[in-house]
């Protein structure tokens, strides 16, 4: 993990009910390393395991900033010393616009809830979430993916 332009990385953490995701990105926005783990109802242990895997026994590189999102964002932010903690509506909107700049609608089916986000002029205009704990929507998709061998 050597950043040739300028030493330093940014750490992104997303702790959800199904998965824990960590990404280490250099100052140019290039992904240096990413980790995907099953949360398994143990968000703290999953985060610690992810941080250990991210460094793979090496000294942690210079982290210029860290951010946390997901249903476990507050917990992850405190444990990792995040500089910023953002809700999933905001992070989905920003991420989607990085991939598709003129995106207008985002639909997300998660382990706990489902969301629809409407953007106007690059800003979240409206959003809605289901009112019942997902009724297993994300968990259902997760099980089907496992049956198909999709990580």
Model-derived features with residue positions:
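Glycine-rich phosphate-binding loop plus the immediately following alpha-helix
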Residues: 43, 121-151
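Short glycine-rich, Thr/Ser-proximal phosphate-binding strand/loop in the N-terminal lobe
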Residues: 7-45, 49, 127, 131
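Short beta-strand-loop/turn "lid" adjacent to the catalytic site in phosphate-handling enzymes
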Residues: 35-39, 55-89, 125-127
């Amino acid at each position: 993990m050597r950043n040739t332009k300028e030493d330093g990385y940014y750490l992104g953490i997303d702790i959800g009910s199904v998965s824990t995701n960590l990404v280490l990105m250099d100052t140019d926005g290039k992904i240096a390393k990413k980790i995907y783990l099953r949360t398994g109802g143990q968000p703290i242990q999953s985060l610690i395991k992810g941080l250990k895997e991210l460094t793979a026994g090496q000294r942690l590189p210079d982290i210029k900033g860290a951010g946390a999102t997901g249903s476990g964002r507050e917990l992850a932010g405190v444990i990792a010393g995040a500089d910023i903690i953002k809700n999933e509506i905001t992070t989905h909107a920003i991420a989607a616009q990085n991939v598709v700049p003129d995106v207008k609608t985002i639909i997300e089916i998660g382990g706990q809830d489902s969301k629809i986000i409407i953007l106007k002029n690059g800003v979240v205009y409206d959003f809605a979430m289901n009112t019942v704990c997902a009724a297993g929507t994300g968990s259902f998709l997760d099980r089907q993916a496992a049956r198909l061998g999709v990580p």
